[in-house]
Amino acid sequence: KGNIIMCGIAGLIHKGKTVNIGKELQDMLQALKHRGPDSTGFALYGEGNSQGDYIMRFKVGENVAEGSSAVKEDKSIYDTRRKQVDKHIRDLGGDIVKDEQLTPYSFRYVIKYDKDLMEFSKAIESVEMTEILSMGKTLELVKDIGDAAVVSKQYGLDKIKGTHAIGHSRMATESGVDIRSAHPFWGYPFSDV
């Protein structure tokens, strides 16, 4: 017999001001590391961009770090999948304004798009192993394997400014240790939910 401790949740709201929510939430979730060290997720409502474009975070594979239950793949497949995503965006009338590769499998795009998000999301996620983590004008959802400090450093979250955020540190009890199973989740296919 022993104590079972699982998962930790933290959130913050700053009314009327923009602050470094990435760093604040990282510190809060790191204090909850004992509640769930397997994966950590951040839902950050940042400043958005001045043009009002969509910010899309997505992955084309899984993190196969120590402790992961994901199947190891040849990393060259990630580039192929990313090119397929780019083609779908163009074919749907979207324009990639800015693209960042954050890990071998994870990306952040700023996109001009003014059509149906459901159609867009289905097309992007039709690419094998591809999942949109978030899409919105201010919401950015980041999740990966590791504690809050590891994930924050990997994605540069300590630089994100905004008004509110919620996060989750996870102990995998009934599903695999992978990004797909990490929390929180995007309200597919709605912007900023």
Model-assigned labels for residue ranges:
Residues G2-V193:
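N-terminal segments that mediate ammonia production and transfer
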